[in-house]
Amino acid sequence: MMKQMMAVLALAGALLTACNNHESNNQKQQNMSETLNLTQTWDKTFPQSAKVDHRKVTFHNRYGITLAADMYTPKNASGKLPALAVSGPFGAVKEQSSGLYAQHMAERGFLTIAFDPSYTGESSGEPRRTASPDINTEDFLAAVDFLSVQDNVDAERIGIIGICGFGGMAVNAAALDPRIKATVASTMYDMSKVNVEGYFKSEDTPEQRMEKRKALAAQRTEDYKNGSYKRAGGVVDPLPDDAPWFVKDYHAYYKTKRGYHERSGNSNDGWNVTGCQSFMNQPLLCWAHEIESPVLLVHGEKAHSRYFSEYAFERMTGVHVEGESKKVGNKQLLIIPGASHVDLYDDVAGVIPYDTLEQFFKENLK
């Protein structure tokens, strides 16, 4: 009887220790994260789904910046789930495209988070509206940190989705972190490439780059004198008559009821002028050729930005492609016929290939 009593006490002690350790770990995570003032009302640019549960969460990156996210969980889910971290477009917030993707994928059985990158939206970080190829790649890695310790997530089945400029960040994250088992980049921008070369290499001479560097250096001096950062302005509004068609597409999303959000830089006064300076000297896709995990690049046939995905595909596979879908090993480029860049931001055109995304992740997160 005494032996049985001792065994029960030992088991109770072990359970209490495990419980205390779990609570201690949770408290440590909370202590490392800043308390954010998060909006609790549904303020997305898309309707809430009855098929998923939603709540706000926060987590921190290794620079001490606390990131705000929306978590979407399939209703009545049980056991450990495959998980996805979603972010983008560049200059958007989680209430826009990334949240839409995250909610759709949660309807299909994944636990998902859509997060605001550092310095934007409801996430912390000063100065506001600045970007970094390092820190914004780190944001994805921090999301993986967070997901990997959730009780209802299988840490061996975590993937990421990057949209627009965060497509490039997602590919960079996949090259850096083997915990990421599968990656989707949708309507991708390579923010390093566009900053250093301009669109279609229109600013790709040493002289043009030097002029950019001089302008950014002068703006830094001016900002320091003023004690504030000059904003570049968001999407042009009102539109000039001669605006390129892709700028009109951006306007139709960011500046109208369709996609406007009060915390979105693109919907309002944009990034700091100097906010993207470091992209000029830090190319995102340097090590894309060493990515071992599966990557799916999705792009519209008519998108002005299609060449970014084609370039990324070539960096990963060594195969040059123009305007057609292609698969080499576990790397795939999917071209959506007739689709523009912004068509992949929301469901208005009905061309986001959710079935393909579901199949891709279910095949590779197992």
For each predicted feature, which ranges?
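Short beta-strand/loop motif that positions the catalytic acidic residue
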Residues: 291, 297-299
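Conserved alpha/beta-hydrolase
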Residues: 104-124
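Short beta-strand element of the alpha/beta-hydrolase
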Residues: 79-89
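N-terminal cap/lid segment of alpha/beta-hydrolase-fold proteins
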Residues: 34-79
